[in-house]
Curated annotation (Swiss-Prot):
Annotated positions binding a ubiquinone: H201
Membrane-topology descriptor: Multi-pass membrane protein
Protein name, per record: Cytochrome b
Annotated localization: Mitochondrion inner membrane
Positions contributing to heme b b566 binding: H97, H196
Transmembrane segments: 33-53, 77-98, 113-133, 178-198, 226-246, 288-308, 320-340, 347-367
Amino acid sequence: MTNIRKTHPLAKIINNTFIDLPTPSNISSWWNFGSLLGLCLIMQILTGLFLAMHYTPDTTTAFSSVTHICRDVNYGWLIRYLHANGASMFFICLYAHVGRALYYGSYTFQETWNIGILLLFTLMATAFVGYVLPWGQMSFWGATVITNLLSAIPYIGSTLVEWIWGGFSVDKATLTRFFAFHFILPFIILTLAVIHLLFLHETGSNNPTGIPSNTDKIPFHPYYTIKDTLGALILILTSLTLTLFTPDLLGDPDNYTPANPLNTPAHIKPEWYFLFAYAILRSIPNKLGGVLALLLSILVLAFIPMLHTSKQRSMMFRPFSQLLFWMLVADFLTLTWIGGQPVEHPYMLPGQLASILYFLLILVLMPTASLIENKLLKW
C-alpha cells in the first residue's frame, strides 16, 4: 500500500513541501531564517489575536486598554511583550534572510526575490501601523511624521495625507483604520509567504557554492527538520529571554506617556528596525528628495538581479565582493545607530556619508568589483 502522505491530496502538498522535498546537502544555518520567519509570523498572529480580544481602537481608551492587558488579563503582560519583542525578532531574522540572499546570489530566482521584496514592504507597513496602536507619545508622533511624508508628493500630497488620516489630523479615525490594517496585513503576509515558497519550490533552493546541486539532493525530513528545530529553539529562547528579562530594551520610554497632540517629544524616532531607512530619509535636506531616498533604500533591492555582473552566482569565491558586502553590513549598522541620534553636529555628516555609501555600494561598487573578479578569472 502506498503511504497516505504521498496519495492524499492535502497530505501530498505538505509532503512535497516539508518532508520529501529534495534539498541541497550543503546548505548552512543561514538557510534556517526562512523557517524562522514562518515561526515568527505564526507567533505574531497568535499573540496578536489574543491582544485584539482585549484592545480597544479608540483614542480615549487605547492607551488604558494596553495597560489593562498588562495588569488585569491573565498573562497579558507576557502576550503583550512577546508580541512587541516578536516584531524585533521578526526583523532580525528578515535582515539575516535578505543578507544571506545577497551574499549567496539567491536573488537570481527573480520571482521568489520580487515576492520577497513585496513581503518586506508589507511587513514594514504592518509594523508601522502596529506601533501606532498603543497610542503613546511616540505612537502618535510617529504616525503624524511618517504619514506627513506623503504630503511631499506633488499636487495630490495634502489630499492624500488627509484621506489616510480620515480628518485634518491623526485622530480616532486614523487609529481605527490602522487597527483594521494591522489585523488584515499579517494574513496578506501569510498568503504572500505561501506564494514565495511556491516560487522557490519551482526552482529548488540555492546553496553556498551557487552551483546547481541537482546531483546531490537529500530529503528535507529528517535532516533539515532537525536543523530547523534547533534554529526554532534558539529563536524561542532568545525571544523569551528578551521578553522576561528586558522587555523594554528595544522600546521607547516615550511610549509610556499617553499621546498628547499639544506636546512634541524632544526626539521623534521609529522602532530600531526602521532606523537605517529613517537615517537615509533625514540625510537629505529636501522633503521630496528624502521621501524618494527612503523609498529607494528598500526598492534598490529590486535592481540587484539586474546589477549582477559576476560570472559566479555566490560570493563564496569572490573576495572583493565579500569585502564590499561586509562594508554594506557595517554601513547598515552605522545608519541604524545614526537614525537613533538627534539631528545635530557630530551625527549629520556621518549620516549623509553612510547614506551615499549605502547606494554607492549596491549600485556601483559591487557590480564593478564583480567585473574586476571576472577579469581575474582569466589570469
